[in-house]
A protein has these predicted regions:
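Membrane-interface segments of envelope glycosyltransferases acting on lipid-linked substrates or membrane lipids
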Residues: 1-131
Length: 131
């Protein structure tokens, strides 16, 4: 089984530590995790590679939206994941979810970390994009 983790950054605590705890255990069962990162570095990169995972760097969606979309779509089409787990700060960040749905294939898990989003537009998007 191949799982793609989206939305983790270079902070070795919080969600990154949580996901790595799962990865350490699931890797023993032959489950593969790959990671998409739009920052210059991802936390635990060396350990990810030691456990058989891969890290794919894509452009930052805020700085290069079209570059992000192109790179993310190419990755999804090439790798064919069973599960795509999207970690996001609010439900307003729907770009990776929409792209995963467009490509199809695996199940998509949306994991939002905040109960609310600041700013009027973000609040509207947050509300509209909740299940």
């Amino acid at each position: 089984m191949k799982i793609l983790q989206v939305g983790l950054g270079n902070n070795p605590g919080g969600m990154e530590a949580f996901v790595m705890n799962y990865f350490r255990e699931l890797a023993k069962q032959g489950i593969t995790f790959d990671f998409v990162c739009m920052y210059h570095k991802i936390a635990y990169e060396e350990e990810i590679r030691q456990l058989g995972g891969r890290v794919f760097y894509v452009p930052n969606v805020k700085k290069d939206y079209f570059g992000y979309v192109k790179a993310f779509l190419e990755l999804l089409q090439r790798e064919q994941y069973d599960i795509i787990h999207v970690n996001m700060l609010s439900a307003a960040n729907i770009v990776p979810l929409r792209l995963a749905k467009k490509v199809g294939g695996g199940k998509v898990i949306a994991h939002s970390h905040n109960a609310s989003a600041p700013g009027t537009l973000r609040k509207i998007l947050d509300r509209l994009n909740r299940p």
